[in-house]
Amino acid sequence: MAQAWAFLLPVLVLGSYVTSLFFPSYISNPLCGGDGGRSLFLCAQAPKDQDPSPAVSTMYKTAFHFQPAKNWMNDPSGPMYFNGIYHEFYQYNLNGPIFGDIVWGHSVSTDLVNWIGLEPALVRDTPSDIDGCWTGSVTILPGGKPIIIYTGGDIDQHQAQNIAFPKNRSDPYLREWIKAPNNPVLRPDEPGMNSIEFRDPTTGWIGPDGLWRMAVGGELNGYSAALLYKSEDFLNWTKVDHPLYSHNGSNMWECPDFFAVLPGNNAGLDLSAAIPQGAKHALKMSVDSVDKYMIGVYDLQRDAFVPDNVVDDRRLWLRIDYGTFYASKSFFDSNKNRRIIWGWSRETDSPSDDLEKGWAGLHTIPRTIWLAGDGKQLLQWPVEEIESLRTNEISHQGIELNKGDLFEIKEVDAFQADVEIDFELASIDDADPFDPSWLLDPEKHCGEAGASVPGGIGPFGLVILASDNMDEHTEVYFRVYKSQEKYMVLMCSDLRRSSLRPDLEKPAYGGFFEFDLEKERKISLRTLIDRSAVESFGGGGRVCITSRVYPAVLADVGRAHIYAFNNGSATVRVPQLSAWTMRKAQVNVEKGWSAI
């Protein structure tokens, strides 16, 4: 239940806005607010009589990202592939574009691109979830039996885990779900546990003893932990006397995810099946407003996760995404033998903007996720199905970019585009020296350097959503540094000039990755532009950055531009540049239900 907990704070006046996400002070019911675990935010909902502005709603609404037709959404919850259908459940407010009154929204798809919106799968109608049906997971039990386990909050805002089953497994859409009569099946009643910091159960897996395991995000004796539980039947659970993993220096871990990966193999692994020799495990947690992870091994004898590298300073932990991305959830796709991950991307405009738009939040494009060949980090790439929306391909080869050059990528829709570009370095001798302290805050370094500050190698990359006079534009680019015997590449997504509006979050996101430039010489960049959502993948998915932008140029049809640029001293060659206009997907087309 990320529930935007890392971002939400109480507000006293509608429209007050800082770089954290604030909400208006409409209190929806007595269950909201109070002391305890909900003290960081207000449950609120929009006034019933306020209609969203059609112009604003459509200007920033995405064309091929997953989001409901209206209202608030946050965490992906329990994605799965079952009987030929992809299911995406998500945290949803039926009543408005503000966080609160959370239920499980439900949509289905056959291709991960076009989605049908259904009735909510879970609503808050029992004592154990009357405060909200928070984040959870789906596990498919032997015999093809899907089961939801999710966090619910009671009237006192204490958290516990609940179970639900499909009412009719022959229904291809699994529209109706029945809650277990013995809910909640897990309470935080062990010594040292915090009843308001106990949420977001993972997908289950089977251990060598044949028992099911599951992890739940929690706080144990003041430490953050992925708490470990065992069960014979997935209904009755016992807490293991030690966590799957814990850390004494970070906040509560939300939305933990635990899955197996094979180095250099982009095929997914099913946790409910035997894990092959040589496999690693990834433990992901949502903390510090971002999604971080560790690579290690699952020690079967100890029944514990053991990181390959223990890093005390969590600023140095690996990141799933370096931008506006949180509460991600992965699942094994048995259809194509891959692991897919989604994340929630919140709005970074103001609460009053969300009220005017009538919607807030979206999910990133589903990504295939796998372990790099060296076993050090996860790689991500948009699922291949998204390419079905490509049209009107534009291709260029052999472009040479000298210092100060701009090359316009014409004849594609600059508002809805997919751009893939390779940058080839003629020389690596001009790379500036690398300062290891930059790893502690790459965003700060992106902001200080900027795309306008020349370097030895770079900045070079893309300028997107640019107005005619460049008053508004977003830069996605690289800088190359020399670090002893290796090279470090900084990837930035700089939003500081993305909009002329002052009331927005406009940071410069950034992340570093190692690159063997002497061997590869080319650095790839793929950027998907979908109106207010921009997702960029650098170095073959080594660094991913999701950005939310709100330029006024979006209202001016046909007036935005995309450029390739170089502002570094060294010449950069572009051996291949391909760009496509992206068609609109059918996202959450209603089928017999008009509330979403």
UniProtKB/Swiss-Prot annotation:
<dbReference type="InterPro" id="IPR013189">
    <property type="entry name" value="Glyco_hydro_32_C"/>
</dbReference>
<keyword id="KW-0325">Glycoprotein</keyword>
<feature type="signal peptide">
    <location>
        <begin position="1"/>
        <end position="20"/>
    </location>
</feature>
<comment type="similarity">
    <text>Belongs to the glycosyl hydrolase 32 family.</text>
</comment>
<feature type="glycosylation site" description="N-linked (GlcNAc...) asparagine">
    <location>
        <position position="236"/>
    </location>
</feature>
<dbReference type="InterPro" id="IPR013320">
    <property type="entry name" value="ConA-like_dom_sf"/>
</dbReference>
<feature type="active site">
    <location>
        <position position="75"/>
    </location>
</feature>
<dbReference type="GO" id="GO:0033948">
    <property type="term" value="F:fructan beta-(2,1)-fructosidase activity"/>
</dbReference>
<feature type="glycosylation site" description="N-linked (GlcNAc...) asparagine">
    <location>
        <position position="567"/>
    </location>
</feature>
<feature type="disulfide bond">
    <location>
        <begin position="446"/>
        <end position="492"/>
    </location>
</feature>
<dbReference type="InterPro" id="IPR013148">
    <property type="entry name" value="Glyco_hydro_32_N"/>
</dbReference>
<keyword id="KW-1015">Disulfide bond</keyword>
<dbReference type="InterPro" id="IPR050551">
    <property type="entry name" value="Fructan_Metab_Enzymes"/>
</dbReference>
<dbReference type="InterPro" id="IPR023296">
    <property type="entry name" value="Glyco_hydro_beta-prop_sf"/>
</dbReference>
<protein>
    <recommendedName>
        <fullName>Fructan 1-exohydrolase w2</fullName>
        <ecNumber>3.2.1.153</ecNumber>
    </recommendedName>
</protein>
<keyword id="KW-0378">Hydrolase</keyword>
<keyword id="KW-0326">Glycosidase</keyword>
<keyword id="KW-0732">Signal</keyword>
<dbReference type="Pfam" id="PF08244">
    <property type="entry name" value="Glyco_hydro_32C"/>
</dbReference>
<dbReference type="InterPro" id="IPR001362">
    <property type="entry name" value="Glyco_hydro_32"/>
</dbReference>
<dbReference type="GO" id="GO:0005975">
    <property type="term" value="P:carbohydrate metabolic process"/>
</dbReference>
<feature type="glycosylation site" description="N-linked (GlcNAc...) asparagine">
    <location>
        <position position="248"/>
    </location>
</feature>
<dbReference type="Pfam" id="PF00251">
    <property type="entry name" value="Glyco_hydro_32N"/>
</dbReference>
<feature type="glycosylation site" description="N-linked (GlcNAc...) asparagine">
    <location>
        <position position="168"/>
    </location>
</feature>
<comment type="function">
    <text>Hydrolyzes inulin-type beta-(2,1)-fructans, but not beta-(2,1)-linkages in branched fructans. Has low activity against beta-(2,6)-linked fructans. May play a role as a beta-(2,1)-trimmer during graminan biosynthesis.</text>
</comment>
